Amino acid sequence: DPQDDSLLMNIANSYSAMGEYAKADAYYDRALTFNPDLAMAYYNKAKLTKEKKEELWKEKCMAYLNHCIKIMPYFYDSNINKAALLREDNKNAEAAEVLTNVIEPTFRPEFIMAILQRGIAYRLIGKMPQALNDFNTVLLYQPHNVQNLSNLSVAHFSMGHINEALYFAHIGLDEAEQQNRHDCDAEFNEVINRIDAMSHTIVRTQ
């Protein structure tokens, strides 16, 4: 009888490939008795559970994925599958957060800050398309970056993108409130007030 977690995993994977899911599941469990921190065993059990779709399969699959993520936080596949399960239940905001947790660490924070600072430089010399490219890149990796949300709002306003400017101003203020970081509030409020003044001017001239 195999007494080695690697060998047990290989046997389990072989059974899984042949479609013998019950035997595969049993061998993954045995591997976990030898090594409770075997993240891939939890991940593979999640895949089996999803494949079989038995009673409460979503709950079981999520539990296995959470075990895997606890051991290997930045294992992309487990996070992607967790996000997919959340989206199936229309929990899109939670799904976005799960994916953000693996996207953010992809690059060093200093690298992202350099892109943000270059975007600010572009914005200040009027190169708005280039600035927007940099700000959107930062948004991809750090969607909660208040300074970047401020620059996105200002850049969109400068380019005449009123809806986008207002959108980023409002979510920026919400994010600032959550983080208790208010150094960009003046910029957010200026964009909102200027758009509000523009809308009143349009109403008066009609």
Please annotate each region the language model reported.
Residues 34, 71, 105-107, 141, ...:
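Structural marker of alpha-solenoid helical repeat scaffolds
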